[in-house]
């Protein structure tokens, strides 16, 4: 399952990152229509198709990282998804309301930190 050279801390890191994405994917699936409509309202063409790929990236990437099977490739999927989420959903640069801008910036910063954790998985 895990490479023999992984420490316990590295395994825990893998599992925590994977849990975040798998959990969010599984909780988003039942609300597919709602999420697809939100993407469409933001001007994303073929929103259902885009959402399907996004959920697939989260699930495949998360499972890949969790079981350490091609974890580097799964990590790339998770980074691409997270970067897209920052651009589409947490675009603080386009927000005029100061409270909303601060909320989006906070979430974008958290997502940037998650990308940092994923990069550490790639480096293993």
Model-inferred region functions:
Residues 38-44:
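Interfacial loop at the N-terminal end of multi-pass membrane proteins
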Residues 1-34, 45-60, 66-124:
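Extended, low-polarity transmembrane helix blocks
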